[in-house]
């Protein structure tokens, strides 16, 4: 079969029309060095600071050092199989994590991927881990309480919604226990919680998750885990990921609580990354921007006003303020709060709860040192009944410590001094509390009323906690309406005081403890 020139021309034209080629332009680079989770890349000319770089094997690195002829990036995950000459490419994206209600009750890693074996997460969307904190005009003053359930904290060092309250102390003195109890106590309050574990043992994280589940608190909690076996990059970024997940609720007019456990280990991970990137070391070998590392994170915890929420949700949510309350944890070495990272975080936060090993070992748990613990803004947020009845607690403890030191040298004491000492001993004993047993507002109010009005006089020290437990049981069964009123309103007036006085007088007469 012979084709004439016209047919050949038509055939060629048809083939040309059907020809389809897709071209893709991408910015590609080559790994020139791999060192302990840090890679140096040549050829990525227009990469952004903090941009995700795609590596072989569906992994990513984050660009941290942008130099004249190379890029220093930190690998998110395993890096042992990366080698010199491997091709990488820029993505044009900043690191984002999933957010939304679907994350509640789940355990995720720094990237928001589930690690609890409960299947995929249907997230509401993705948001960047690094965000700018709300401005001055967008904020509102702190005036609503976050009840931790601890008598010593809620009475003396109250925490408000949108506050940053540091929990600081040596290892093994109850820092995590206090934070976990605060999360457990938010059950039924509508406050969503985020627990960020940085550099913890995997067994410790598993134990926390188990305890939250046992006490019905996992349903309102997101656990972000970057255990000690994870890379330094994942440990450094975990608090920012958790913060973004918490901000989702804040920006939609809800209240959230986030625990960073702990920021000392995050600073160590960041120091490791910085030294490997050959950034100049400063005090204690930390890089120069370690203050900014924590300040830009903790400034994102805030109470935002109605206008901010309305603008953020495009008018969907009106008349609601949102808040993100932060409880950062810092571990000190031998009680040294003047080290670099502790002083940084103390200066950033709105107060600190200082836990002491000596008090912990003496059986005073929670081991709160009332003398140097402070809440700078929480007083305005305190519940009325606890503010009114708890006011004398700090003073009683301060006087007791002063007199206890003096009485070691004085042989005989006058009656007034002895009475103050005994009152201080009773207050110290009453402030003790078991783990995983946070108190309601009414139960706490009853305990504070008992010590304030002298109902603990004449009770042996070793019987005070038994007296308190029996009193709570009696009040919740015999005076349920009064307890319900106090729990719902948090008010304290002459009528409530009179009813409490009658109830405690009757209870003390029964001698049932």
Swiss-Prot record:
Locations listed in the record: Cell inner membrane
InterPro entries, alphabetized: ATP_synth_asu-like_sf, ATP_synth_asu_C, ATP_synth_asu_C_sf, ATP_synth_F1_a_nt-bd_dom, ATP_synth_F1_asu, ATPase_a/bsu_AS, ATPase_F1/V1/A1_a/bsu_N, ATPase_F1/V1/A1_a/bsu_N_sf
Swiss-Prot/TrEMBL catalytic activity: ATP + H2O + 4 H(+)(in) = ADP + phosphate + 5 H(+)(out)
Presence of the UniProt keyword Nucleotide-binding in the record: yes
Top-rank taxon: Bacteria
SUPFAM superfamilies named among the record's database cross-references: C-terminal domain of alpha and beta subunits of F1 ATP synthase (SSF47917), N-terminal domain of alpha and beta subunits of F1 ATP synthase (SSF50615), P-loop containing nucleoside triphosphate hydrolases (SSF52540)
Site (Required for activity) location in chain: 373
Cited Pfam families: ATP-synt_ab, ATP-synt_ab_C, ATP-synt_ab_N
GO-annotated molecular function: ADP binding; ATP binding; proton-transporting ATP synthase activity, rotational mechanism
Alphabetic keyword roster: ATP synthesis, ATP-binding, Cell inner membrane, Cell membrane, CF(1), Hydrogen ion transport, Ion transport, Membrane, Nucleotide-binding, Translocase, Transport
UniProt-annotated binding residues for ATP: 169-176
Protein EC: 7.1.2.2
Record-level GO cellular component terms: plasma membrane; proton-transporting ATP synthase complex
Membrane topology category: Peripheral membrane protein
Alphabetical list of NCBIfam families matching this protein: atpA, PRK13343.1
Task of the protein: Produces ATP from ADP in the presence of a proton gradient across the membrane. The alpha chain is a regulatory subunit.
Recorded family membership: Belongs to the ATPase alpha/beta chains family.
Subunit structure comment from the entry: F-type ATPases have 2 components, CF(1) - the catalytic core - and CF(0) - the membrane proton channel. CF(1) has five subunits: alpha(3), beta(3), gamma(1), delta(1), epsilon(1). CF(0) has three main subunits: a(1), b(2) and c(9-12). The alpha and beta chains form an alternating ring which encloses part of the gamma chain. CF(1) is attached to CF(0) by a central stalk formed by the gamma and epsilon chains, while a peripheral stalk is formed by the delta and b chains.
Protein name (record): ATP synthase subunit alpha
Protein species of origin: Alteromonas mediterranea (strain DSM 17117 / CIP 110805 / LMG 28347 / Deep ecotype)
Name of the encoding gene: atpA
């Amino acid at each position: 079969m012979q084709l004439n020139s016209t047919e050949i021309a038509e055939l060629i034209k048809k083939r040309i029309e059907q020809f389809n080629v897709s071209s893709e332009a991408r910015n590609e680079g080559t790994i020139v060095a791999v060192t302990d989770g840090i890679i140096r890349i040549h050829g990525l000319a227009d990469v952004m600071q903090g941009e995700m770089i795609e590596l072989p094997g569906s992994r990513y690195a984050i660009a941290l050092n942008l130099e004249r002829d190379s890029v220093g990036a930190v690998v998110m995950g395993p890096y042992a199989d990366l080698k010199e000459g491997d091709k990488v490419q820029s993505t044009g994206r900043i690191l984002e994590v999933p957010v939304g209600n679907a994350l509640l009750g789940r355990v995720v890693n720094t990237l928001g991927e589930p690690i609890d074996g409960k299947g995929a997460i249907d997230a509401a969307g993705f948001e960047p881990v690094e965000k700018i904190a709300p401005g001055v005009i967008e904020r509102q003053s702190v005036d609503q309480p976050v009840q931790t359930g601890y008598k010593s904290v809620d009475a003396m060092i109250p925490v408000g919604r949108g506050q940053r309250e540091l929990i600081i102390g040596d290892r093994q003195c109850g820092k995590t226990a206090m934070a976990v109890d605060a999360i457990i106590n938010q059950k039924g309050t509508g406050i969503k919680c985020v627990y960020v574990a940085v550099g913890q043992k995997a067994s410790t994280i598993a134990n926390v998750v188990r305890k939250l589940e046992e006490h019905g608190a996992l349903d309102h909690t997101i656990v972000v885990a970057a255990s000690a076996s994870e890379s330094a990059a994942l440990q450094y970024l975990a608090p920012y990921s958790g913060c973004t997940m918490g901000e989702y609720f804040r920006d939609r007019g809800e209240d959230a609580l986030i625990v960073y456990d702990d920021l000392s280990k995050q600073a160590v991970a960041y120091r490791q990354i910085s030294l490997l990137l050959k950034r100049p070391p400063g005090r204690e070998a930390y890089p120069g921007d370690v203050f900014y590392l924590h300040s830009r994170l903790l400034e994102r915890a805030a109470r935002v006003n109605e206008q901010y929420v309305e603008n953020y949700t495009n008018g969907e949510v009106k008349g609601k303020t949102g808040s993100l309350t932060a409880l950062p944890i810092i571990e000190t070495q031998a009680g040294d709060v003047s080290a670099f990272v502790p002083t940084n975080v103390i200066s950033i936060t709105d107060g600190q709860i200082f836990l002491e090993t000596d008090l912990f070992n003496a059986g005073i748990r929670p081991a709160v040192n009332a003398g140097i613990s402070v809440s700078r803004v929480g007083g305005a947020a305190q519940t009325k009944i606890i503010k009114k009845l708890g006011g004398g607690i700090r003073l009683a403890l301060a006087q007791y410590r002063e007199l206890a030191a003096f009485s070691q040298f004085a042989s005989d004491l006058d009656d007034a001094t002895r009475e103050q000492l005994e009152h201080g001993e009773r207050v110290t004993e009453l402030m003790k509390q078991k783990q995983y047993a946070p108190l309601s507002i009414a139960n706490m109010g009853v305990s504070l009323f008992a010590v304030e009005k002298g109902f603990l006089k004449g009770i042996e020290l070793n019987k005070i906690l038994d007296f308190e437990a029996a009193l709570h049981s009696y009040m919740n069964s015999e005076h349920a309406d009064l307890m319900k009123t106090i729990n719902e309103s948090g008010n304290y007036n002459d009528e409530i005081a009179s009813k409490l006085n009658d109830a405690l007088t009757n209870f003390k007469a029964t001698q049932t403890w």
